[in-house]
């Protein structure tokens, strides 16, 4: 199947500059293409993952992806999709983020992959202001720039000259990569359409209207309930394991709505059409088994964090479901309960009622006794119904933690003071 046909059935294409021309080109030869990311932070989140999954598909089809880290454009700020001006980062911060994102990309694509990393600071930093204005600014029509959504949406609230010129810098990126590496396709999110077409216009003005360059954007990802994909009550789901643990990452995918899961399987996994159709049938016939969600969680967690992290996430999930918390290792306890409320307790044995009230897990001694008597309190996975029980924090988890649950879902991680 042609790569464009595959992306079409996956629903992964939003807009194309020349659909027939690009399909013909990719059918006739292997091409070089690129997608960029600005180092506005030191990690990508799952929203960033979508275009780079597309890049991986091109690689698997034999094409040559280039990943552009915007060391220069990241110091300016992309106005796309924003209502307000970005805060400028220090160059030290930008360089720190460039290194972090480069490492993240290398983990995603693998060290032996046919993917090339580039940094636009290498060429944009060498262009003087006069050269920029003479060589590129002269070719860009202000009226055209003002008409693009990325600028037009900001005219009422205001946009700085710095951010206004961003699309010219991204256009120079496309031109430079086309000249130096024969890159013919740029991929980006739906909000990058204006920047991508600006680059194509610049190339056509310099090299001729028949120059074969293309642009393709991915759809804006919304959940079935209309809310933005990738956000939770706790914030963004990051690709960095230090920001979002593999267990939390795995659980995010496991908890997806039946209405969304098949679309996500198409976007975020490399499963074929037949297998995805089988999982779609399972969602219809046996939704309670959540087979599609399990497969989605497995595939994406393995791709982002690797096999070992996936197995650990599955192990933690299995233990928490069974309630046998004492089988968790210290590291797994920290990973499983990193987002639950934390409390501090002394290392000496303490009466259960006093411990629950002193840590504010229970609002009063009366409520604590009532919950204990009713079996609503578990300590390290064991139900405690004795209000006179003495709890020894040193008994489990090497004396470092105590896991307390009130009711069915309210977990607390008690950290034992040294």
Swiss-Prot record:
Residues 350-417 form the S4 RNA-binding domain. GO terms for biological process: tyrosyl-tRNA aminoacylation. Keywords: Aminoacyl-tRNA synthetase, ATP-binding, Cytoplasm, Ligase, Nucleotide-binding, Protein biosynthesis, RNA-binding. ATP binds at residue 231. GO terms for cellular component: cytosol. A motif ('HIGH' region) lies at residues 39-48. It catalyses: tRNA(Tyr) + L-tyrosine + ATP = L-tyrosyl-tRNA(Tyr) + AMP + diphosphate + H(+). It holds the Pfam family tRNA-synt_1b. Its main location: cytoplasm. It is an enzyme of class 6 (ligase). InterPro entries: aa-tRNA-synth_I_CS (IPR001412), aa-tRNA-synth_Ic (IPR002305), Rossmann-like_a/b/a_fold (IPR014729), S4_RNA-bd (IPR002942), S4_RNA-bd_sf (IPR036986), SYY-like_C (IPR054608), Tyr-tRNA-ligase (IPR002307), Tyr-tRNA-ligase_bac-type (IPR024088). Its EC number is 6.1.1.1. L-tyrosine binds at residues 34, 166, 170. A motif ('KMSKS' region) lies at residues 228-232. It comes from the Bacteria. It is found in: Cytoplasm. Homodimer. Catalyzes the attachment of tyrosine to tRNA(Tyr) in a two-step reaction: tyrosine is first activated by ATP to form Tyr-AMP and then transferred to the acceptor end of tRNA(Tyr). HAMAP family: Tyr_tRNA_synth_type1. This is Tyrosine--tRNA ligase. It comes from Levilactobacillus brevis (Lactobacillus brevis). The gene is tyrS.
């Amino acid at each position: 199947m042609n790569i464009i046909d595959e992306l079409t059935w996956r629903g992964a294409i939003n807009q194309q500059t020349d659909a027939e021309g690009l399909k013909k080109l990719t059918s006739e030869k292997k091409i070089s293409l690129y997608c960029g990311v600005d180092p506005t932070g030191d990690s990508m989140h799952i929203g960033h993952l979508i275009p780079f999954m597309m890049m991986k598909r091109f690689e698997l089809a034999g094409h040559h992806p280039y990943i552009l880290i915007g060391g220069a454009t990241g110091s300016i700020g992309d106005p796309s999709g924003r209502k307000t001006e970005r805060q400028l980062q220090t160059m030290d911060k930008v360089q720190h983020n460039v290194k972090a994102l480069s490492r993240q990309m290398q983990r995603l694509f693998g060290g032996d992959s046919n993917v090339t990393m580039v940094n636009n600071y290498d060429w944009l930093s060498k262009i003087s202001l006069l050269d920029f204005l003479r060589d590129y600014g002269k070719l860009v029509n202000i009226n055209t720039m003002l008409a693009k959504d990325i600028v037009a949406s900001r005219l009422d609230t205001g946009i700085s000259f710095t951010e206004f010129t961003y699309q010219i810098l991204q256009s120079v990126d496309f031109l430079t990569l086309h000249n130096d590496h024969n890159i013919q396709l740029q991929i980006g999110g739906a909000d990058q359409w204006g920047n991508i077409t600006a680059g194509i216009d610049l190339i056509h003005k310099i090299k001729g209207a028949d120059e074969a360059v293309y642009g393709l954007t991915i759809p804006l990802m919304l959940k079935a309930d209309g809310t933005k994909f990738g956000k939770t009550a706790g914030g963004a789901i990051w690709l960095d394991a230090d920001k979002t643990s593999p267990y939390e990452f795995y659980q995010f995918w496991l908890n997806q709505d039946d209405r969304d899961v098949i679309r996500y399987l198409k976007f975020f996994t490399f499963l074929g059409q037949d297998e995805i159709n089988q999982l779609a049938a399972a969602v219809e016939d046996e939704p309670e088994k959540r087979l599609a969600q399990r497969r989605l969680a497995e595939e994406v967690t393995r791709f982002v964090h690797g096999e070992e992290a996936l197995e650990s996430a599955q192990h933690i999930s299995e233990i928490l479901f069974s309630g046998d918390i004492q089988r968790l290792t210290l590291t797994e306890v920290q990973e499983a309960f990193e987002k639950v409320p934390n409390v501090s307790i002394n290392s000496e044995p303490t009466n259960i009622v006093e411990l629950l009230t002193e840590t504010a897990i229970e609002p009063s001694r009366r409520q604590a006794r009532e919950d204990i008597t009713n079996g609503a309190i578990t300590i390290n996975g064991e139900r405690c119904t004795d209000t006179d029980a003495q709890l020894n924090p040193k008994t489990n988890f090497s004396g470092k933690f105590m896991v307390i649950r009130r009711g069915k879902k309210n977990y607390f991680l008690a950290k034992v003071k040294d």
